[in-house]
């Protein structure tokens, strides 16, 4: 009996299985590792098969493993293809968005065309294209963008810029400076399209300043009325926006463009009076010559459509067109009242009925007083159904302007004026004190309480309170603790109707509390805005010395803020008596 087996080794068979023969006698420790008999028979049959058949059968792949690889590779390929399609679609959508998206609200902050807004804090986007001068329709078609930048360089031939966050409220304590630089030999045309900045005398707190480099300041604006188009003869402008830490507004938006010298223009609703200057339409034929060539006041009789004119008698009457019927739309009437030198003028309105609006922006009457220098100073603007207080002026010239828009019409007014001889006595206004009219600060009834022969009798009877003028406690927090505790409203000197309006205004002055001169400035400001009410029912302005002390102490501090002293102290009375003015 054989104790060994015959073994035939084939190289190709070794590829099919690592173990072609198994004998437990030679590997006792392996345990039952031999394949089952069926498998042994299968191996034996494969060894007995022809060589080429065994070769072909040995090269067949594992079907289960191959299908798994195919599925895996197919999935990866589909995933990559999907990612590629997504990237392509995203790029196509990004490039087609400006053409398919409608313009957002045109009140958003504007960004120049063709430039992606920068995220750098101190940069502002500008145009880099050399497009021709824009028309109004082209400007409106531009797609505005919410702009958060504050200042920067604007080197392109045209562009837009706006206050931070426009049209939302601009942040407090902002100081943004834009430098507009166009090519040498070109000049800059600037247009402020929208404006809503805290309004205050001389734009003391929040303001937009335009400065020509290197000549100096051109314009300072605040409030809610955009100025006319600004044409310059420089290629470099510096635009500065400043806000304090109190009252905010929506700010501004503006555009600029490079213009060849001599090719300046104005907007369609503006008056182009000479090479550079543009005027708002309501500044034309208003009695104040602003154009160097006087063209804004030329041929005004033809423009007023039969209203307005020159009144030179000692007494006169004038009225709105069609009075007492409704006045026409789009009227601009100017009456020039002139009496002999040495006379003043008393103006009174009767049956007053104009379109009512809080700021008298639509239909209104304005009164101007001539100065000794030949210019006109603004006295007041009136509208609504209540006649204005009588206007008494020490000057011998007044200008009365009546303007209407396209909207509501009403009955208008009838007005009379009378000349007053200022040289007949030492108390020229005594007989007119009872009217309590709106007048120059130096010609108030209080100044003339001591009349001829040092007697108070002539004027004291006329110092009774006005029908709607009664003393009331001072309620403005900033003005508590003055030398007096009663006031009266309306305040005809500054055009404020209630103490609430004063409180709103004084919020802007809180930023000055840190100045060394604040207490002196506070006394003067409260004396002007919340005047003293006397036991006789009259109101007293602050004395000139109070204003001068505040000016002397605060002028240098305000200069550091870039603001000149905003008040003319010479308009206030000298303390001729205890009842001439107040010492808050």
UniProtKB/Swiss-Prot annotation:
PROSITE patterns referenced in this protein's UniProt entry, alphabetically: CUB, FZ, LDLRA_1, LDLRA_2
Subcellular location: Apical cell membrane
One GO biological process term: visual perception
Segments in the Cytoplasmic topological domain: 1-69
GO CC annotation: apical plasma membrane
Disease named in the record: Defects in Mfrp are the cause of retinal degeneration 6 (RD6). RD6 is an autosomal recessive degeneration of the photoreceptors causing dysfunction of both rods and cones.
Organism field: Mus musculus (Mouse)
Location of the LDL-receptor class A domain: 265-301, 426-460
Record SMART domains: CUB, FRI, LDLa
Keywords, sorted A to Z: Cell membrane, Disulfide bond, Glycoprotein, Membrane, Repeat, Signal-anchor, Transmembrane, Transmembrane helix
Lipid bilayer topology: Single-pass type II membrane protein
Protein name stated in the entry: Membrane frizzled-related protein
Gene3D superfamilies documented for this protein: Frizzled cysteine-rich domain (1.10.2000.10), Low-density Lipoprotein Receptor (4.10.400.10), Spermadhesin, CUB domain (2.60.120.290)
Annotated region (Disordered), positions in chain: 108-140
Oligomeric and partner information: Interacts with C1QTNF5.
Domain CUB: 150-259, 307-420
Residues covered by the FZ domain: 466-584
Tissue expression pattern: Expressed in retinal pigment epithelium and ciliary epithelium of the eye.
Chain segments annotated as transmembrane: 70-90
Disulfide bond sites: 150-176, 203-222, 266-278, 273-291, 285-300, 307-333, 360-383, 433-451, 445-459, 471-533, 479-526, 517-554, 543-581, 547-569
Xref: InterPro entries: CUB_dom, Frizzled_dom, Frizzled_dom_sf, LDL_receptor-like_sf, LDLR_class-A_CS, LDrepeatLR_classA_rpt, Sperma_CUB_dom_sf
């Amino acid at each position: 009996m054989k104790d060994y087996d015959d073994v035939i080794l084939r190289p190709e068979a070794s590829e099919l299985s690592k173990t072609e023969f198994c004998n437990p006698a030679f590997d006792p420790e392996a345990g039952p590792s031999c394949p089952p008999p069926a498998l042994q028979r299968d191996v034996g049959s494969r060894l007995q098969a022809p060589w080429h058949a065994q070769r072909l059968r040995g090269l067949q792949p594992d079907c289960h493993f191959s299908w798994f690889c195919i599925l895996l590779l197919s999935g990866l390929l589909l995933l990559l293809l999907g990612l590629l399609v997504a990237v392509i679609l995203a790029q196509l959508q990004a490039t087609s968005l400006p053409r398919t998206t409608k313009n957002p609200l045109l009140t958003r902050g504007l960004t120049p065309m063709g430039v992606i807004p920068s995220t750098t804090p101190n940069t502002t986007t500008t145009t880099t294209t050399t497009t021709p001068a824009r028309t109004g329709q082209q400007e409106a078609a531009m797609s505005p963008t919410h702009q958060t930048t504050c200042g920067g360089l604007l080197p392109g031939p045209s562009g837009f810029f706006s206050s931070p966050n426009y049209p939302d409220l601009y942040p407090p304590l902002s100081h943004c400076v834009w430098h507009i630089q166009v090519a040498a030999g070109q000049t800059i045309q600037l247009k402020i399209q929208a404006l809503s900045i805290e309004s205050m005398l001389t734009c003391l707190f929040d303001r937009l300043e335009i400065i020509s480099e290197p000549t100096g300041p051109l314009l300072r604006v605040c409030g809610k009325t955009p100025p006319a188009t600004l044409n310059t003869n420089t290629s470099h402008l510096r635009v500065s926006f400043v806000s304090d830490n109190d009252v905010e507004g929506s700010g501004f938006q503006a555009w600029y463009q490079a213009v060849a010298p001599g090719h300046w223009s104005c907007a369609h609703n503006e008056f182009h009076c000479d090479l550079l200057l543009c005027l708002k339409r309501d500044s034309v034929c208003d009695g104040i010559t602003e154009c160097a060539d006087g063209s804004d006041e030329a041929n005004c009789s033809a423009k007023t459509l039969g209203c307005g004119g020159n009144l030179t008698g000692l007494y006169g009457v004038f009225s709105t067109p069609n009075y007492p019927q409704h006045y026409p739309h789009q009227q601009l009437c100017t009456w020039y009242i002139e009496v002999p030198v040495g006379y003043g003028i008393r103006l009174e309105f009767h049956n007053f009925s104009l379109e009512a609006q809080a700021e008298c922006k639509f239909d209104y009457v304005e009164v101007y007083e001539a100065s000794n220098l030949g210019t006109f100073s603004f006295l007041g603007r009136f509208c609504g159904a209540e006649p204005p207080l009588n206007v008494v002026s020490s000057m011998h010239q007044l200008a009365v302007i009546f303007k209407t828009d396209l909207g509501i019409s009403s009955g208008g007014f009838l007005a009379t004026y009378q000349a007053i001889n200022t040289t007949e006595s030492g108390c020229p206004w005594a007989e007119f004190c009872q009217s309590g009219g709106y007048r120059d600060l130096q010609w108030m009834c209080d100044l003339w309480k001591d009349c001829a022969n040092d007697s108070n009798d002539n004027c004291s009877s006329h110092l009774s309170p006005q029908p709607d003028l009664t003393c009331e406690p001072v309620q403005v927090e900033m003005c508590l603790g003055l030398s007096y505790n009663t006031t009266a409203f309306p305040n005809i000197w500054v055009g404020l109707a209630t103490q609430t309006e004063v409180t709103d205004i004084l919020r802007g002055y809180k930023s000055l509390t840190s100045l060394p001169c604040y207490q002196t400035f506070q006394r003067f400001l409260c004396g002007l805005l919340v005047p003293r009410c006397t036991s006789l029912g009259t109101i007293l302005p602050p004395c000139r010395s109070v204003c001068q002390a505040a000016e002397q102490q605060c002028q240098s501090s305000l200069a550091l803020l870039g603001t000149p002293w905003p008040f003319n102290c010479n308009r206030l009375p000298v303390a001729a008596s205890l009842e001439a003015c107040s010492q808050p």
